[in-house]
Amino acid sequence: MIGRIRGVILEKQPPVVLIEAGNGVGYEINMPMTCFYELPDIGQEAIIYTQFIVREDAQLLYGFNQKQERALFRELIKVNGVGPKLALAILSGMSARQFVTAIENESISSLVKLPGVGKKTAERLVVEMKDRFKGLNGDLFEQNGDIELPASASSKAPSAADIEAEASAALIALGYKPQEAAKMISRVATAGADSETLIKEALRAAI
């Protein structure tokens, strides 16, 4: 099982990052956008904690910046009706801290704003996740003591159209319909904003 990858970032196509490990192999890793935002730029080194998921039609890696975020993902996919794709969408719309707070406060109104989460799923999340937090919450937000990596350098921005298309594609991958994703991005589009900023603002506006 692949639990941790350290390597150089080759490509970033939200919510997927391609990272080359020391053996020269490139790993495609699906990441929640709340984790994706924290990645260094292309060409820089990153450490990603991973969860390997095997399906009938695919073998997928999901990645996180902290072990605790991965632990939360593992608990989420144990909830009835919540698969890896929905768990990824949930942790893209809310940070781990925000999600824990929403569950503890039984904030159904916040949870139903997440893509793919209806009222019944939100209620199920509150019921099933509250007990699971007892084993997680104590260290969920502690620093993990990993080696600090060098700060990333600025990269050259693509065209505004490319940025908006990339941001829309990321929202579609998280479960939003194409038309809905395009509208969400157009509402927050500003000159000079990169795709990660547009995605972050679009998800924030949706909550």
From Swiss-Prot:
GO terms for molecular function: ATP binding; four-way junction DNA binding; four-way junction helicase activity. Residues 144-158 are annotated as: Flexible linker. Pfam families: HHH_5, RuvA_C, RuvA_N. One of its GO terms (biological process) is DNA recombination. It is found in: Cytoplasm. InterPro entries: DNA_helicase_Holl-junc_RuvA_I, Hlx-hairpin-Hlx_DNA-bd_motif, NA-bd_OB-fold, RuvA, RuvA_2-like, RuvA_C, RuvA_C_sf. It comes from the Bacteria. Has three domains with a flexible linker between the domains II and III and assumes an 'L' shape. Domain III is highly mobile and contacts RuvB. HAMAP family: DNA_HJ_migration_RuvA. The RuvA-RuvB-RuvC complex processes Holliday junction (HJ) DNA during genetic recombination and DNA repair, while the RuvA-RuvB complex plays an important role in the rescue of blocked DNA replication forks via replication fork reversal (RFR). RuvA specifically binds to HJ cruciform DNA, conferring on it an open structure. The RuvB hexamer acts as an ATP-dependent pump, pulling dsDNA into and through the RuvAB complex. HJ branch migration allows RuvC to scan DNA until it finds its consensus sequence, where it cleaves and resolves the cruciform DNA. This is Holliday junction branch migration complex subunit RuvA. It comes from Proteus mirabilis (strain HI4320).
